[in-house]
Amino acid sequence: MEQEWLQVRKKLQRSLSKGQYDLWVSTLEFLGIEDGNLILGCQNRFHIEWLREKLEAKLLPIASQHFRGVRKLEYRVAQGCAAGAPEIEGAGPRQIAFSDVVKCVGPAFNPRFTFDHFVVGGCNQFAYAAAMGMANNQQLYNQSVYLLSDTGLGKSHLTHAVGNYLRNRKPELRVQYVTTEQFANEMIFSLKNGNMEAFKNKFRTGCDVLLLEKIEFLSGKEKIQKELVYTLDELMDRGKTVLCTGNAYPKDIPKLNSELQSRLGGGLLAPIDKPDFKTRIEIIKRKSHTENIRVPMEVVEYLADRITGDVRQLESCLVGLMAKSNILRTPITLDLAREVSQTMLDQLPKISVEQIQKIICANFRITLEELRSTSRRKQVALARKIGIYLSREYTTESLQSIGKSFQRSHSSVLYAVNEVQKGMGEANGRLKREVEYLSRRLETSCLSES
């Protein structure tokens, strides 16, 4: 059976990066098969949790091909691994603890997502204040708040923070927390079972605070949108509070009817931007403090400079660093940080100028020939300008290379980039919204193709 396990590992090696394989698979031990369960020896509990969450969906089908009758995977902390490893001199990294899921009546809010655990910076200060003000019932603005940002920047954290705050401070309030997908599924189920009154009671008369995430899911779902409009109207009429989240301004979400756009856009709109360098440093320091692990300042600054995407990427890189340090029983150093961050960056989808041009043309409904032409038509000129800017932001191509792709001179490319950068400085300007919307489309498209 050792040969079969070797074949499983070889297949995994072909589908994973070298860093992922070395860290998570090469350290696995084949312990045998019991009652249809493939028993694997792991380094520690963190190793087990990572395998369950990230690799099991890929590992189980491969194992079933090579081990007849295997239906499940079972993980055990192998003897002599974490417990018996020699101690490193000095303060070594501790085992990463996983909080148990809090069992409670009503919506399940992540206990880690609180206002105290939210790192506030210039990128999210307004959204934080809006969510906190709503939780405190400060009547400084409309009773509706809409948080918008790209994925991984803190919308869900703030939404759960409101829920946790209300549950602890105002338990008498009836709080409903759902994603729009859950809202839609409950509505469809109620329709099929002739129980729409119960559905309406839950979200209208039986609700004091509605927390509704991922509005973009409703794109094109006309009947669900109409029901949500009725729900929002009744809640507003009764003086109740609503917090919604989305990945774009309501009016920029495609196939969202004008009534719903109006209801959502009529409240307080609170965008969240990507964290700046200073905020990224604070996020890393807060996360390492929460995990009770000491990370040298030079490593903190290196990660903050290297990982410039969303908060989730930053925390994921830090967790990977702590995991590797923990599993290998080695201190956290700058060299280890370089290795882990490079492994993570290698996994991110690469975006090309051609992909950017394709999305730009589709959005502005122009041809590639028009985009590259000398046309000064307003629509074409705007598309070209944004395309050049996004190429500068998302690729490693030089200005000269970008100019060649758009059939423009170096100075024309530089002018276009500067023009868009000026427009991005306007808080609610049309150009800024257009660029943010196309950036989201570009990132989503590349992630789905990777």
Swiss-Prot record:
Top-level taxonomic group: Bacteria
GO annotation, cellular component aspect: cytoplasm; plasma membrane
Matches recorded under Pfam families: Bac_DnaA (PF00308), Bac_DnaA_C (PF08299), DnaA_N (PF11638)
GO molecular function, one term: lipid binding
Binding-site positions, ATP: 152, 154-156
Keywords for this protein: ATP-binding, Cytoplasm, DNA replication, DNA-binding, Lipid-binding, Nucleotide-binding
The keyword Cell cycle is assigned to this record: no
Region Domain III, AAA+ region, residue ranges: 108-325
Location, primary (coarse class): cytoplasm
SUPFAM superfamilies according to UniProt: P-loop containing nucleoside triphosphate hydrolases, TrpR-like
Region (Domain II): 70-107
Biological process (GO), any one: regulation of DNA replication
Protein localization: Cytoplasm
Region (Domain I, interacts with DnaA modulators): 1-70
Domain IV, binds dsDNA: annotated segments: 326-450
Summary of subunit composition and partner proteins: Oligomerizes as a right-handed, spiral filament on DNA at oriC.
Its biological purpose: Plays an essential role in the initiation and regulation of chromosomal replication. ATP-DnaA binds to the origin of replication (oriC) to initiate formation of the DNA replication initiation complex once per cell cycle. Binds the DnaA box (a 9 base pair repeat at the origin) and separates the double-stranded (ds)DNA. Forms a right-handed helical filament on oriC DNA; dsDNA binds to the exterior of the filament while single-stranded (ss)DNA is stabiized in the filament's interior.
Free-text comment about domains: Domain I is involved in oligomerization and binding regulators, domain II is flexibile and of varying length in different bacteria, domain III forms the AAA+ region, while domain IV binds dsDNA.
Family: Belongs to the DnaA family.
Protein name, per record: Chromosomal replication initiator protein DnaA
Organism of provenance: Syntrophobacter fumaroxidans (strain DSM 10017 / MPOB)
